Structures are given as C-alpha cells and as structure tokens.
Amino acid sequence: MKKLLVIVYPDMNDVEYTNTMVVFGFVKELQTVIYHPNLSTVKGSNGVTLVNQITSKVNLEEFDGVFIPGGMGATKVLDHDQQLLDTIRYFKDHDKYVFAICDTPNVL
C-alpha cells in the first residue's frame, strides 16, 4: 500500500482539496494522512471545507509522496510557513512524489 501525506493550510482551495480527496478515496491501494504541524482545524478559502481530522506529527520516511492543494492560501500562508516548506522539501530531496495544484507550484 502506498502512503500519501496531504498538507492542509488555511485558505487552501476547497474544490481542489475535496475533489482530489474524493479521487484518492477510490484508490484502494492508497492511504492518505491529513497533516499540519500546528493546526487542528483548517478552513478552506470558500468556507465550504472544514478539515478537522489533522495529524500534527508524522514520520516522513513512511510516505511515498505529498499532495498540496492550491488556492490563495498558497501565497498568503504556505509561502511563509518554513516548517511546511521544509516538509515539502524533504519529499523533493528524497526523490519522492510531490503533487501540487494551482498556485502551490509557484510557492515551491
């Protein structure tokens, strides 16, 4: 089974997060773990999505890749969060999958 870390952050795009998570849910060989190091609840930019099953401690070596939804929060929040950027950098530096949508690649 493959394991994917899903980084969430305030003002991420609701549609990009929810639609992608629905697709991931159809993949029986994929386990997703929702992650933010400091927040227990994250609200999407449109106020439609409220994520509250967030893990704050993970062993990055256990994951095959990372997914980061986009949206306005990418440049407002993610771009200034060194801990999250270091987490994403780990996947790049270890030749693991990095999936990013919309504005997130601009931050990376």
From Swiss-Prot:
It comes from the Bacteria. InterPro entries: Class_I_gatase-like, DJ-1/PfpI, Prot/Nucl_acid_deglycase. SUPFAM superfamilies: Class I glutamine amidotransferase-like. One of its GO terms (cellular component) is cytoplasm. Pfam families: DJ-1_PfpI. This is Uncharacterized protein MG029 homolog. The lineage of its organism: Bacteria, Bacillati, Mycoplasmatota, Mycoplasmoidales, Mycoplasmoidaceae.
